[in-house]
Each structure stands twice: as C-alpha cells, then as structure tokens.
Regions:
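Alpha-helical transmembrane segments of multi-pass integral membrane proteins
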Residues: 92, 96, 100, 121-207
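Specific transmembrane alpha-helix
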Residues: 34-50, 63-114, 131-132, 156-179
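Hydrophobic transmembrane-helix microenvironments that flank and shape a buried ionizable site
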Residues: 8, 13, 34-37, 89-92, ...
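Extracytosolic (periplasmic/ER-lumenal) interhelical loops and adjacent juxtamembrane/interface segments
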Residues: 4-23
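Alpha-helical membrane-protein architecture signal
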Residues: 5, 25-29, 94, 183
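Membrane-interface helix caps and helix-loop-helix hairpins in membrane proteins
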Residues: 24-28, 77-86, 147-151
C-alpha cells in the first residue's frame, strides 16, 4: 500500500520522474512522465516568456546551451543512467526553445506578410517542406541501427525538433497548401484528441 500511495502522489504532483521507483518502476501509466516534464516547464514558462520577449536570441541560446550541456555533459557520458536521465526537463529545454522560437517567428512574420504579402512564397517553401520530410525519414531510420537507443534519442531530440519546427513554419506560411494539409477536419479532429490518444495508447497496447 505504501508503494502504491507513493506512486500515486508522485504522479499527481508531477514529480514521478525524480525517483527511479516512481518513474522506471511505476505501476501507473508510464507515459505520464510527459505531463510531469510539461508541468515543470510551465512553472518556468512565465519567466522564460518574459525573457524571450525582451531578448529572444539570448534566451533561446541560453535554453539551448543548458539543454546541450545536460545531454552531452551529464547524460551521454553515463550510459548506465540514461533511462533515468533521458526524460528530465533539462533534456527538453532545447525542444521547448524551438517551440517558443517558432511562435516568435510566426507572429513576427505574419504581421509583416499581412502588410506586404509575397505571392510566390508557397512555391519557395515547397522544397523546404520536402527537405524536412527527407530529414525526418533519415532520423527515423537511424534509430533502427542505433547501438544504444536512449543515447540516440537524446542526441537526435534537438535536431528532430528543429526539423519539425522548420516543417511547421513552412506549412504555416504555405497558403492554401498548408491549410489543406493542416487545417482540414480530419487533422483538426486528431489534433484535438492527440494527447489523450498518446496517453492511452501504450497502456492499452501492453494489455
């Protein structure tokens, strides 16, 4: 009973990733570690957002530097601890930085494009979209040949999020093409249920 209560309290407080017992040994849905990392980030977000508005490049580089230091300086040199280290908040700061940068670039560019639209912009973005898809495919295939999958995942997390950022920005500015791909009813439906689907898929699959 004590272990179950500890497991439950850690999950409800979004602190389960801090202990091997409640993270690696949890009897609750294992994918809920993502909610813990996100909630920890939300605690920092008001400060980071304020810094990003004032000094976007410095804030981005600071988040990226902290994340890469944790990945390459702390985690990857300790392969025996990777399962515990790979999904801690510092490892994701670079991913969150890309998301904040994407929002910043989109907001800034949208205002300028509204004032001075570039009609041929979607045509220029099509090669960017194609290139991004090629990179995503290469990263996906690289995982199959990785000697240590957690190490590969940690090393590729920032490049992968960078490719996704590039792809989403390109699609967002690709006019009717982007709206057809991202704004249709089917994708809007899956967008609405995507996180719930992610939370339940492993729990159902392993049973």
């Amino acid at each position: 009973a004590g272990e179950a209560i500890r497991d439950l309290l850690a999950t409800l407080s979004f602190t389960q990733v801090f202990s091997p017992r409640t993270y690696l040994g949890t009897k609750i849905n294992g994918v809920l570690w993502t909610a813990a990392v996100e909630m920890q980030f939300y605690l920092l977000f008001p400060l980071l957002a304020r810094c990003f508005r004032k000094k976007p490049l410095l804030t981005y580089l600071s988040m990226l530097g902290a994340s890469l230091l944790f990945v390459y300086g702390v985690s990857l040199p300790r392969p025996e601890q990777l399962r515990m280290l790979q999904n801690q908040l510092p490892a994701f700061l670079s991913v969150f930085a890309n998301g904040m940068a994407a929002a910043y670039v989109y907001t800034l560019s949208e205002k300028r494009l509204a004032a001075r639209p570039i009609r041929l912009l979607p045509l220029f973005l099509l090669p960017v979209i194609a290139f991004s898809l090629v990179l995503l495919n290469r990263i996906r295939h690289g995982a199959a040949g990785a000697e240590l999958l957690p190490a590969y995942q940690m090393a590729m997390r920032y490049p992968l999020s960078l490719v996704f950022t590039l792809l989403l920005l390109a699609l967002s500015f690709s006019g009717r093409v982007g709206r057809a791909l991202l704004g249709n009813r089917i994708l809007r439906f899956f967008a609405a249920i995507s996180y719930e689907l992610y939370i339940w898929h492993q729990w159902i699959a392993v049973r």
